[in-house]
Amino acid sequence: MAASSNDASKSAMANSNVTTEVAQTPSKEQDVNGEVEATEEDGANGQLPDNIFQIKIKLPHEPFEIPMTISTAEQVQDLRQSIIEMPNTFQYSCFHLEHKGQRINDFVDLSEVPELGPDSVLEVKEDPYNEKEARLHVIRVRELIGAAGDRTDALHGIMAGLSLHDTVGLDQSGKPKEDGPEQSPLADYDFKSSGAIKNLLPPPQEPAPKCIKSIALSAWNPPPYHLRTKGHLLYLVAMTNENEQHHITSHVTGFYVNKSSNASFDPAPRQGPKALHAHSLLTLLEKLSPSFEASFQQLLEHNAKKELLTIFQLSNAIPANPWLVPPPTSSLTTHQPDLARTQESYLISGVENTDTLRDWNEEFQSTREMPKEAVHDRVFRERLTSKLFADYNDAATRGAMLVARGEIAPLNPTEAKDAQIFVYNNIFYSFGADGVGTFGTEGGDEAARVAVGKDVIGVRAVNNLDIPNLFTSGTVVVDFLGKRIVGQSIVPGIFKQRDPGEHQIDYGAVEGKEIVADDKSFVPLFEQLSKALRVKKHPVWDKDNVRHELEGSVETKGLIGTDGRRYALDLYRLTPLDVAWIEAHWSEPSKDEDAKPSEKNYPHRMATLRPELVESYGRLKLREYVKNEIDKKANKARGGRRRLPKAQKKADAGKEVDGEKKAEAEPEQDRVDISGFSFALNPDVFSGQTPQSDEDKAEWAKDEAEVRAACDHLQTEVIPRMITELKDGEVGFPMDGQSLSSLLHKRGVNIRYLGKIAELSDKPDPRLQALKRLIVQEMIARGFKHFANSKLRNVSAPFSAACVAHLLNCLLGADANAKPVAECDEEIKRMISTPEDDFSFEKLTPESLKKEVIAQIALRYRYDLGESWVESGKELQLLREVSLKLGLQLQTRQYGFTKETLTNGAAVPTPAAPQTNGSSTSSKKKKNKTITPPRADSPAVSLPSQTFHADDILNIVPVIKEASPKSLLAEEALEAGRMSVAQDQKELGQELLLESLQLHEQIYGVLHPEVARAYHTLSNLLFNLDDKASALELAHKAVIVSERTLGVDHADTVLAYLNLGLFEHASGNTKAALVYVRHALELWKIIYGADHPDSITTLNNAAVMLQAMKQYHESRIWFEASLAICEDVSGKTSINTATLLFQTAQALALDKDMRGAVNRMRESYNIFKDVLGAEDRNTKEAESWLEQLTQSAVSQAKQLNDLAKGRIRRIQLTGRNPLRPAAATPSVSDAAAAAGGQRTGTGRVDQRKIEDLLKYIEGESSKTPTKKRTQNPRKRTQKP
C-alpha cells in the first residue's frame, strides 16, 4: 500500500527510479523468502547461496532490532522499501541506513557496501523532514490507517482492478457456502441457464475497522513565512475515535500537538498531558488516541485476511475496468466524507505542482540510451522503460480525457474542431480525424482514424526492435466519448519553423508525397528496421519524377530533432496494402462527389496486411527456397541418402507446415546455406508511384506480383486453414470478441475479413455454426460501436449517458419496448446545449438503428446479415461486447430484454435471459436482494418502461491503445527455461524458469498483464516438473493478476481459473478445485453463453473430480452433460462421442444404473466398430466392458439383495488416482474396494499421471484413454 504514496511522488527520472521498486512485490519479505525457497532446492544440502544471508537491522524505537534476509543482488533502496513495508517498522519513512557508522547511499547495490556480510548490523537513522518528505509521510500514514477512504480517480473507473479470487465460493453474506454432507460445490449448477451477473461482483464486504475518524490538512495551512524559517512544514487536524480534535504541526524534527483550534492559530507545542511529540505521525496518533493501537491491529488483521495481490495498488499497468459495477447505493461503493481527498494532489506534488511535470521525450530517449551490455544493466534499463511507459500511458490518457471533454484550450482555436491541437503536461494531443485533408484521397476521417491506430502498432514494433540511435516518440491512442485522440511526447524541433528551402522532414515524404527527402544519416538506421520488418529497399519518385532510393515506405518519416537524435515518425505503413481487398472493395473518390457504387464503397484505403501475415508468407518462401536448394543438390548427387537440413527444420518448427516436414533426407555433411535467401515486400506498390525507367518498371512489376502473392496466401491458405483447425478442434475455440480478434491477429488475418470467415463457416458442422454465430455477434457489436461513436462524438458530456442508454434500448431492448424514449433532461438541455450538440439520436428507433448497423456491417465486413440479428438468449453477451468496446460501466441489475422479463424482473436483481425467465430458484432471488438493492429513483420522475435507463450508465472509461515494448530479457529467460525442459534438463530448466519469473516481476512489477501470462505459463511448466506447490501458488497469482489487469471475465481469466482447479485437485483439494471450476463455468456463460464447444473437457474434468469425492450420482450427471454437448458439436457417431459414451457408461455403473451403463457401452462399441473396425484396440476394449457390464446387469436383476448392500459385481475397477485425461475408468466404488479391486487381463485401465491430464487440458495430449490412441479427439481449453 505504500506503493501508491511513493508512486504518487515520482518527480523525475531519478525519483521514478527510486519508486519503481515499490510495484515489484507486495512485501519484500515474501519476495526474499520466495527467492530463498527457490534456491534452497538448488543449493547443495539446502545451503543458501553466498549472496543471500541474514543481517540485523537496528531501530531507534521498539522492537530495537529485527532480523532480515537480504540478497546482495538488490539495491539499498529495495532493502529500504522492505523496512518501510514490514509491520514492525511501518512508522519509518524518512530515514537513512548506516553501516559501522558510515551512511550508505540508497542508489548502490548491497554488494557494493563495504564489509557487509552475514550477521552484519545496519542501523536505521531518522532524518529531519523537509516539506516533500512530510507530505509523503502524511499520505503514507493515511493509507496505512485506512483513512484515505475511496478515491475518485478521473482515469480509473468504478472498482477498477477488481479481483474476485478471495470471494469465489462465498455466498451473498460473504460466508463460505454451506454444503451438506451429500452435496458438492456443483450441486445446484444449471447447465442451460444463462449467465448470472451476480458472479461478476464480490459479495458485500464487512467494513474495515476505523482507526481514526479523519485526518487532513488544517485550514491554517501552509505555514506563514516567519514560521517556515523555524522549521514548520504543514499543519494537520485529526479527529480521533474518541471524538477529540487535535491540531498537529509537522516540523522538521517530526510531529507534535499544537495549541491551535479551528478559530485561533497558535502552532507552538501544547503544554500539559497532551504535550506529545514523535518523529512519526503514526506513533503520535497512537499516543493521542487510547483506542488507536487496538483498532490499528484489527485493521492489519482485517487486511491480512485478503490475498495481498488483491489489494496492492497497480503502478505499472492501467487496471481493468469491469463493465458491470454495483449501483451507487451498494455497500461496495460507499462514498465517505474525506476533506483530504481534495488535498491529495497538493500532498502528492506540492504547491507548484512541479513534481509531476516531466519532460517525457527526454526521459524516453535517455532511457533508450542507457547501457545494455551487462545483464544487470539490461534489467535496470528494461525496468525503468516499463515504469516510464506505464507513467506516460497514465498521464497521456488523463490528458486525452480532458481534451475530449473540452477542458483544455487548443493552440489553434480558430481552426476547425478536428484540426485543433493541444499541449498538456508536456504531451501533444491531436484528434484521430483528417482535420487538414492529409488523407483526402485515402478516405478522409476514416483513413486518419485507422492510420493513428496502425501508428501505435508500428511504434510498438520499432520499440520492440530496440535499434540503437533510432528513436520514437511516446504514443498513445485513446478512444473516449466517441472521439479518438492521439497523445505523443513532443519531439524537440517538430514545431520549429524551418528556413526557406529546408524541409520540415529529413527522410521520407514531405507535404503529401510531392517532395521526398532522403538524408543519408537515416539509411543505416532504417536499413536495420526494414530488414527486421521485411521491408524492401525501393525507389520512389517525387512530383518532378526525381528518383529517390528509400529504405522504408515513403509514408514513414525521419526527423532529426534539435537534440541531434534521429526520430522515426508516422509508422502506419510498415507493411504493403492488401491490394486484393482494395481492388475488390475500394474506388477512388470522384471529382464531382458522386456516391460510390455499393460494392466498392469501403470507407478507406488504409487496408494493409498484418505483420504476422508478412512473417507467415516469409516462412513459406523460405521453405520453397530450401526445397529448391535440396532439389539442386539432389540432382547433383543422385542416389545418396538425404536428410532434412537444419534450416528447413528451423523454418518448419511450430509453423503451419502440412506435408513438407516429411521432406527428403540428405547426406550427413550437407547443409542448406540460407544466407542467399532474402525476402522483403515493397510497401509502396499500388500507392500511386510511377516508375520511370524500364528497369524500374520491371522491378516494380515483380514487387507488385510478390505483394499480390502474399494477399493470395492470406485468402487461399491462411484463412481456410484457420477454419479447418477450428473445425477439427486443433486450436482453442474463441469465447468472445477479444479472443476471436487475438486468434485472427496471431495468424495475420485482419478484422475486415470477419464477413468472409462467416461465409466460409456457414456449413452444417456444429463447431463452424458456433463460430459463425460468434462472428455475427462480433460484427454486430463492431458495427454498433462505429455507429454509436458517430452519435456520441457530437453530444456534450452530460447527455452521453442518455445517448448510450437510448442506443442500447434500440439495439437490445426492442422486444421489451418497441418504441424506446431517450431520457434527456429537457431543462438541462435548454440551459447548456449548443448548436454543435447533435440530438438526432433521440429520433432513432430499433428499426432505424438496425438498418444503420446492418449498413455498417455491409460496408466494413462485406457481409449481408440477411435475416439474422441479435441472437435470442445472447443479449447479455452482446451487451458485454458493446460495453467493453465503448468503455461503458453499467449498473448491475437484471436487464429485461423481453416484455415478460421487464415486467417480472422489475424488482429482482438477478439476471435472466429471455428463454430461462423464472428458472432461477426463489432462494437465489432472495440472496441477490442483499447484494443489489432496488434502484433508488426519485419518486418525482416516472421513467418509461424500457430495458436501459440513463441512470444505468454509471460511467464511461477510455479505451487505450499503447506502444510499450515487451521485456526481451524476461522472454529470453522463459524461452531458455522452456528449451531446457524440452531437452529433459529438468534442474537447469527449473532454475531458468524461476529466474524468468523473477525477471518478469522485477521488470514489469507484479501486477501487469505480461506477468499474468508468465505466471500461467510457468505454473504449467513447473507442474510438469513435479513442483506442485510452486505451480499451485503461481496459478493463484495468475488468476488474481489476470483479473486485475485484464478483467474479471476476460477469456484468459477463465483459463486461469480452470488451470487453478486442476492444480488444486492434483494437490488433494478437490472441493476447492470444484469451486474454481464452477466459477469458471459461470463466467463462461456470461462471456459466451451455454454449451461452448471447448467446455466438454471442463465438464468432463469436473465429473472426474466428483468421482474422486465419491459423488457418483452427481458425477454421472456431469458426464451426461459433457456427452450431450459432444454429440451436438462432434456428431453422434464421432470418436469423441464414443469415448465419452465409454466414460458415461462407467459412471452409470458406479451410480448402479446397470441397464443404462449397458446401453451406453453398446453405443460406444458400435461407433468404435463402425469407425475404427472390429480389430481396433478401442473396439475390443469397449467389447470387453460391454460383456462385463451385461453380466453385471443380469446379476443385478437377479440379486437385488447384493445391490442393496452396495456391491457392483464383476466390474473391474481400479483403486488408482481417478483423475486422468480421459477419465477412462471410474474411481473405485466401496464395493469394488471391498472385493479387493482385482483386475482382469481384459480390463486394461488407463493409469496416466496427473501430468498427462495437464497436457490434455492444455491440449497437448489425446482425449481418449491410452488404449484408444487411433484418433485424437482434441478438446482444448487453451488459447491457440
Curated annotation (Swiss-Prot):
State its location(s).
Cytoplasm
What segments bear the compositional bias annotation Basic and acidic residues?
649-669, 1245-1261
Q: Which GO terms describe its biological process?
A: intracellular distribution of mitochondria; mitochondrion organization
Region (Disordered) residue spans: 1-49, 169-189, 633-669, 905-943, 1214-1280
- Compositionally biased spans, kind Polar residues: 1-27
List where Low complexity composition bias occurs.
1221-1235
This protein's superkingdom? Answer: Eukaryota
Per UniProt, residues of the Clu domain are: 338-582
Composition skew (Basic residues), residue ranges: 635-648, 1265-1280
Acidic residues biased stretches: 32-43
Family the entry assigns = Belongs to the CLU family.
Q: What does this protein do?
A: mRNA-binding protein involved in proper cytoplasmic distribution of mitochondria.
The molecule here is called: Clustered mitochondria protein homolog
Q: Which organism is it from?
A: Phaeosphaeria nodorum (strain SN15 / ATCC MYA-4574 / FGSC 10173) (Glume blotch fungus)
Supply the gene name.
CLU1
